[in-house]
UniProtKB/Swiss-Prot annotation:
The lineage of its organism: Eukaryota, Metazoa, Spiralia, Lophotrochozoa, Mollusca. Glycans are attached at N93. Disulfide bonds join C49-C60, C54-C69, C71-C80, C86-C97, C91-C106, C108-C117, C122-C133, C127-C143, C145-C154, C159-C170, C164-C180, C182-C191, C196-C207, C201-C217, C219-C228, C233-C244, C238-C254, C256-C265, C270-C281, C275-C290, C292-C301, C306-C317, C311-C328, C330-C339, C346-C357, C351-C366, C368-C377, C387-C399, C393-C408, C410-C419, C429-C440, C434-C449, C451-C460. The keyword Disulfide bond applies. GO terms for molecular function: calcium ion binding. The gene is FP2. It comes from Mytilus galloprovincialis. This is Adhesive plaque matrix protein 2.
Amino acid sequence: MLFSFFLLLTCTQLCLGTNRPDYNDDEEDDYKPPVYKPSPSKYRPVNPCLKKPCKYNGVCKPRGGSYKCFCKGGYYGYNCNLKNACKPNQCKNKSRCVPVGKTFKCVCRNGNFGRLCEKNVCSPNPCKNNGKCSPLGKTGYKCTCSGGYTGPRCEVHACKPNPCKNKGRCFPDGKTGYKCRCVDGYSGPTCQENACKPNPCSNGGTCSADKFGDYSCECRPGYFGPECERYVCAPNPCKNGGICSSDGSGGYRCRCKGGYSGPTCKVNVCKPTPCKNSGRCVNKGSSYNCICKGGYSGPTCGENVCKPNPCQNRGRCYPDNSDDGFKCRCVGGYKGPTCEDKPNPCNTKPCKNGGKCNYNGKIYTCKCAYGWRGRHCTDKAYKPNPCVVSKPCKNRGKCIWNGKAYRCKCAYGYGGRHCTKKSYKKNPCASRPCKNRGKCTDKGNGYVCKCARGYSGRYCSLKSPPSYDDDEY
């Protein structure tokens, strides 16, 4: 054990050396530690950082056979023995520090000044009235004013004293310094102008000026024009001695002399009289009314209410004061305002023995009760009608009685005397033989086409002039 310690001590002295020159920490460090290359040995070399060569808390890192110092706190040099005057940076307000020998110099910016750039041209703020200070160059500044203030330090207010005349209101303007808002009637940069002085309106018109430097004239009744220079009654528009006066709304009215009318008294509506048949003309200003004598009517009494006779069927016409101007006295049973309604012959009950009377407006017919016949149902029927008594036609067949015999007209699908036999005969209308909207009707052994208006022929295929009667075949 003692032998090993001796060998270690000998190796330490050999590797590190004992005659290292001394150095002053305040001087430039030119010392370079030697690089030792010991001969191969079975013993490991000693770490060069064990003697802590790095000053002021520098961190030592071995590098091959030597070491390297990583300095802290503004120190530099191979062994961190030299001091950097700019670390830490003592210059204020983000200014740049420049080392000068063992001391330093501050390069100021943004309006800062002083040894450490600790002062600023905008602190305290030299701008008055809430003006905003901005550094200008190294030692200068610029004030951005607000609220209508101007001047190098915002010490002057643009609206004090008020430059606006005639009760105009002053408002600060960032472009021109101020702006005037004039009351009605005044205009100009300082509200010094009034368009109504002197008054440009003639004939007692009232002038009203606006804030834009323009004016308008309110004219007295009867006067008009941009400056009330014209009069509605000059020259006089009323004819035939009519008197002109203003209507109060920019126009005129004419007071006409007797017998004349119209807007300018040019018309005498009753001369010559427009009323005929001794009717009396009444002047209504620009119009007239005719008062007609009895029996005449119309706007000019030119119509005789009874000529031509409005009463029909030999009725007699009499003038009266009704809305129509006449009244009809009907004869022969006719009725209505103009005797147009014919008498109903059924009112006299011409059908006897329970017969029913039917009137179509032209003639009447009697539908007799069973057992009676004739025009007025006065003749007895000696042979009973089997169509009524026994109803011989079956299956919706139609019974036809001619007074002597009957026959059955069977419905489609049935045949025989009494329509009791089924018939498989094809319906002739199934093929739609009738053209142009014609209506097909089965007639037992054939069919009949009832043509629409304007067509004719068996199949309604022929065009024909319009007729009130439809053709059947």
